[in-house]
């Protein structure tokens, strides 16, 4: 028995340890339940959160605005973000960075870098020698990469979300333009790592908008496909998307709505910013013409003046969208000269005429990629701020040939709301209604490799092969497996972009390198030597295009296969019996699914890639498999593979083959006798086929990134440290400013209080002069030396002043509280005295209070009266400038003591059962004897806390009183002090009404 107890103790300890760990995990999880989304626009960003009790809410920034400028101002000793940075664009345009997202993932020779220099010549860009990218040179000692600047913005967005949610947030979904390539997407992910954010997904902004549109219209989506076009023209870019909505059947949740991206078209430079730049140039020209002959400098050479003109151009674009003309005016544009000029909408449209001609371009691209016509589009919906320009709507309406353009979506916040819905769906802390999202690959990706072939006996040559890995407009996320055959030594292959003919020449130059990665495999020959008795099934490379649209090579492995015959003698009687029974129901043997060793893998069921075709001569050299195909029951099944290039493990549909595959038919025929009778055990031993066993060997992989090298880990760590130091510096600055403001406010408030009568009444002239002198000295110090003072010094100065004024403030505060506290004490004393008098007037036969209880209450009342009178008399003798003896906390303590005694008696009166009156033979009530005391009557008293209730016998009540008085079988609801009791009739009525509600 002792041994058993000893064995149970470790188990109990382990159980309690697991419970403690689980509780700790739950508590940690509850602190970080909120998730966020960031809609990164070219000019501004929108942040949304989801937390328990707050479903899908846009975050308000510190200025209570729903969108925040994507602007950063960097100086030597300070940094500004958001609206404060946008305000610094006029004062310090060189240090204020905007529209830097256009530089992400681009090298110095990219046309977009030259365009950025032309648009914002005030910024100095230098070249990173390692990656050949650009960096902002703020000062000789201060430079930042575009990823670092974006990391600052993302960190700022998280701080806004955390302040709004009132809890820490780490998980986020970030929107990116649909046309971002691999280098640009990796740059955003690196920026998020610098900010300390865990990116659940990089979602395309057009997909997020489509998701937001579908989520709020779930009821309108049915099995009939609905094609909707979203035209999104923002500040910097334009994207047109064709989306198909319909319900599909899923394995997990049955019929659910789905959105599928069918076509995408875009223009990287068409947007509101280009219109503003045209207007800025027009205003600069007008200003120069007004100053002609004054020997003035060109306004274009003044960065501050150009920043003012750009801000005015932005305002003009907005106003001219609703008015035919407007007066542009800027005070002190340059050299204290004011600028004023009238601009009409017609002039603005003439300046941007070539831009409006490009509006239909993305529409045609989207239709071509979707292989659809405008007749199949049911609705065209406007998204983005630049679509509010009337000319854009006019040209677009003519291009799509519709009666009207849809404006039934929040053009500014739709992407943020869709992204935060996806964040909640990806988070484990929330459960949302399923909405299937099938995004599309914009740029096809293929695998290229070369191998030696023998065209003629003795003549060998190299043959270049290509295979599409992810086709254009194919769905993602999904994984692919490429199998390389006939390789007996180490080899290389390349991952590149596919056919980009749909891009124009300018877009191809902006796109950058079309070569992604070179993969070098090591250990192929050694793996073949390791398994000489196995048949090689080739080298399998596993690729994954994840939810963020980022391509990765998960692993490369060498696969071998052999036939293994199971010995019938090894099977037990139970195994034979189980196999026989399972064969009666058409099931296979369990031995076919066994794994042999740790390296054996199960057969995968794979399907061919959409749109991939084998070139002549490639069959047998390379096979392609779909590792994790995206489920879509609405799409037709892929065609049956032919030849050696068919995906391994592919099995025809059971319905097409009569419910049996070719590999299963001989086995099933051998297992079943006439009329389905199972064969004898001897026959089963002979007819049982050998099973296949797979062995895999990991192959070494060396990757060489060709499009844009990622930041090395040490460089990334330095960037993270740099951003953390800036954040700490900002926090210290905020803390110092808060301390300085508190000190300054205390000085001003106290100086004013010294002249108020209530403060002069409780202080002497000497005391006021001492305080006033200290305040003046601190104020002088703050003006002279406060700019260089640390946070600790400011807090110490404030603490000294508060200590000096503590007595004065205490006396004033006490005198303010006296009237209210004394009035409350008097009321309580009066009510307590009245209650005591009433209690003593209760007839002796009905008395529920003991003499000790009433005497105790009387003593407390008398003591309180005596304390009050004595303290007031003593306080009247003291001068107002001395510390008072009548303290508000003492008054509150006396009130609490008196109230406690009264509440005890009140509770006793509430819950005491009245003594039932017995009846005589004639049916009349018998009065208790005159000499009956209160202690002889039955009562129920609420016992003090921590003491058990004493059980007392209770006489059975009369039948006539059972409806109004509770019986012993009915539990009484006991309330605490101050609780109100309700009549039993009302409780019964409530019970009856609740029963009626249930019916």
Curated annotation (Swiss-Prot):
The modification N6-acetyllysine is found at residue 883. Residues 574-583 have a biased composition (Polar residues). It holds the Pfam family HSP70. CDD domains: ASKHA_NBD_HSP70_HYOU1 (cd10230). Gene3D superfamilies: 1.20.1270.10, 3.30.30.30, 3.30.420.40, Actin, Chain A, domain 4 (3.90.640.10), Substrate Binding Domain Of DNAk, Chain A, domain 1 (2.60.34.10). It is found in: Endoplasmic reticulum lumen. One of its GO terms (molecular function) is ATP binding. InterPro entries: ATPase_NBD, Heat_shock_70_CS, HSP70_C_sf, HSP70_peptide-bd_sf, Hsp_70_fam. GO terms for biological process: endoplasmic reticulum unfolded protein response; negative regulation of hypoxia-induced intrinsic apoptotic signaling pathway. Induction: By anoxia. The modification Phosphoserine is found at residue 567. Residues 564-694, 909-999 are annotated as: Disordered. Has a pivotal role in cytoprotective cellular mechanisms triggered by oxygen deprivation. Promotes HSPA5/BiP-mediated ATP nucleotide exchange and thereby activates the unfolded protein response (UPR) pathway in the presence of endoplasmic reticulum stress. May play a role as a molecular chaperone and participate in protein folding. Part of a large chaperone multiprotein complex comprising DNAJB11, HSP90B1, HSPA5, HYOU, PDIA2, PDIA4, PDIA6, PPIB, SDF2L1, UGGT1 and very small amounts of ERP29, but not, or at very low levels, CALR nor CANX. PANTHER family: HSC70CB, ISOFORM G-RELATED (PTHR45639), HYPOXIA UP-REGULATED PROTEIN 1 (PTHR45639:SF3). This is Hypoxia up-regulated protein 1. It comes from Cricetulus griseus. The gene is HYOU1.
């Amino acid at each position: 028995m002792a041994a058993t107890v000893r064995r149970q103790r470790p188990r109990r300890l382990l159980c309690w340890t697991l419970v403690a760990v689980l509780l700790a995990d739950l508590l940690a999880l509850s602190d970080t339940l909120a998730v966020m989304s960031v809609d990164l626009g070219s000019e501004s960003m929108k942040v949304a959160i989801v937390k328990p009790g707050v479903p899908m809410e846009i975050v308000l920034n510190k200025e209570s605005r729903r969108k925040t400028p994507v602007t950063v101002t960097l100086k030597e000793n300070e940094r500004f973000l958001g609206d404060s940075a946008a305000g610094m664009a006029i004062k310090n345009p060189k240090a204020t960075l905007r529209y830097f997202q256009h530089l992400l993932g681009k090298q110095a020779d990219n046309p977009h870098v030259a365009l950025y220099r032309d648009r914002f010549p005030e910024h100095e860009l230098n070249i990173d020698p390692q990656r050949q990218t650009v960096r902002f040179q703020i000062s000789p000692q201060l430079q930042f990469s575009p990823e670092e600047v974006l990391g600052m913005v993302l960190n700022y967005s998280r701080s806004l979300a955390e302040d709004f949610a009132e809890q820490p947030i780490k998980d986020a979904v970030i929107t990116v333009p649909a046309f971002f390539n691999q280098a640009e997407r990796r740059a955003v992910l690196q920026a998020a790592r610098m900010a300390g954010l865990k990116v659940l997904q990089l979602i395309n902004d057009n997909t997020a908008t489509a998701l937001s549109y579908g989520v709020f219209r779930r009821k309108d989506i049915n099995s009939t496909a609905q094609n909707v076009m979203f035209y999104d023209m923002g500040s910097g870019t334009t994207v047109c998307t064709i989306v198909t909505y319909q319900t599909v059947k899923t394995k997990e949740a049955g019929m659910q709505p789905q959105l599928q991206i069918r076509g995408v078209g875009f223009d990287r430079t068409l947007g509101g910013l280009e219109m503003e730049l045209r207007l800025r140039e027009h205003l600069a020209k007008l200003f120069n013409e007004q100053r002609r002959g004054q020997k003035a400098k060109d306004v274009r050479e003044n960065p501050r003046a150009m920043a003012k003109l750009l801000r005015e151009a932005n305002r003009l674009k907005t106003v001219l969208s609703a008015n035919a003309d407007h007066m542009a005016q800027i005070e002190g544009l340059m050299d204290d000269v004011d600028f004023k000029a009238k601009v009409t909408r017609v002039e603005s449209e003439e300046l941007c005429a070539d831009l409006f001609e490009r509006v239909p371009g993305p529409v045609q691209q989207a239709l071509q990629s979707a292989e659809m016509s405008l007749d199949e589009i049911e609705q065209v919906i406007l998204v983005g701020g630049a679509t509010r320009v009337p000319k854009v709507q006019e040209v677009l309406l003519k291009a799509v040939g519709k009666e009207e353009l849809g404006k039934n979506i929040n053009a500014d916040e739709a992407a943020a709301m869709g992204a935060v819905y996806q964040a909640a769906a990806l988070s484990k802390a929330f459960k949302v209604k399923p909405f299937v999202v099938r995004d599309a690959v914009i740029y096809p990706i293929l695998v290229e490799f070369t191998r030696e072939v023998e065209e003629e006996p003795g003549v060998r040559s190299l043959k270049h092969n290509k295979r599409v890995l992810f086709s254009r407009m194919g769905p993602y996320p999904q994984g692919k497996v490429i199998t390389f055959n006939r390789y007996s030594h180490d080899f290389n292959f390349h991952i590149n972009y596919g056919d980009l003919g749909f891009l124009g020449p300018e877009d191809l130059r902006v796109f950058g390198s079309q070569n992604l990665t070179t993969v070098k495999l090591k250990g192929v020959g050694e793996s073949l030597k390791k398994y000489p008795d196995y048949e090689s099934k080739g080298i399998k490379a596993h690729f994954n295009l994840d939810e963020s649209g980022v391509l990765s090579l998960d692993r490369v492995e060498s696969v071998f296969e052999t036939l293994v015959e199971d010995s019938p003698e090894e099977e037990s009687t139970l195994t034979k019996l189980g196999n026989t029974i399972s064969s009666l129901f058409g099931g296979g043997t369990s031995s076919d699914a066994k794994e042999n060793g740790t390296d054996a893998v199960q057969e995968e069921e794979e399907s061919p890639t959409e749109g991939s075709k084998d070139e002549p001569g490639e069959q047998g050299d390379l096979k392609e498999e779909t590792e994790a195909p995206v489920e879509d029951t609405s799409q037709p099944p892929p065609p049956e593979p032919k030849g050696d290039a068919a995906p391994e493990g592919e099995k025809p549909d059971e319905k097409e083959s009569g419910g049996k595959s070719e590999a299963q038919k001989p086995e099933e025929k051998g297992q079943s006798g006439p009329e389905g009778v199972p064969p004898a055990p001897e026959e089963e031993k002979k007819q049982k086929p050998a099973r296949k066993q797979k062995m895999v060997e990991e192959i070494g992989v060396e990757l060489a990134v060709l499009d844009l090298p990622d930041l090395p880990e040490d460089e990334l760590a330095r960037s993270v440290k740099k951003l953390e130091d800036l954040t700490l510096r900002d926090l210290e600055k905020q803390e110092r400013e808060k301390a300085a403001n508190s000190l300054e406010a205390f000085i001003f408030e106290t100086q004013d209080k010294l002249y108020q009568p209530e403060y002069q009444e409780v202080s002497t002239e000497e005391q006021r002069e001492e305080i006033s002198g200290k305040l003046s000295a601190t104020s002088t110090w703050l003006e002279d030396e406060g700019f260089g003072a640390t946070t600790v010094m400011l807090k110490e100065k404030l603490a000294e002043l508060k200590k000096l004024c503590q007595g004065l403030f205490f006396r004033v505060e006490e005198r303010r509280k006296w009237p209210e506290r004394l009035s409350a004490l008097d009321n309580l004393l009066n009510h307590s005295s009245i209650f005591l008098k009433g209690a003593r007037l209760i007839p002796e036969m009905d008395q529920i209070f003991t003499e000790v209880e009433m005497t105790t209450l009387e003593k407390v009342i008398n003591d309180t009266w005596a304390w009050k009178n004595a303290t007031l008399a003593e306080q009247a003798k003291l001068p107002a400038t001395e510390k008072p003896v009548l303290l508000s906390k003492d008054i509150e303590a006396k009130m609490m003591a008196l109230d406690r005694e009264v509440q005890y008696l009140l509770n006793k009166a509430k819950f005491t059962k009245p003594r039932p009156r017995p009846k005589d033979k004639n049916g009349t009530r018998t009065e208790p004897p005159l000499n009956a005391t209160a202690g002889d009557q039955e009562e129920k008293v609420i016992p003090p806390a921590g003491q058990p209730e004493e059980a007392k016998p209770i006489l059975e009540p009369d039948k006539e009183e059972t409806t109004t008085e509770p019986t012993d079988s009915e539990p009484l609801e006991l309330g605490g002090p101050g609780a109100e009791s309700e009549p039993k009739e009302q409780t019964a009525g409530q019970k009856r009404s609740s029963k009626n509600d249930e019916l």
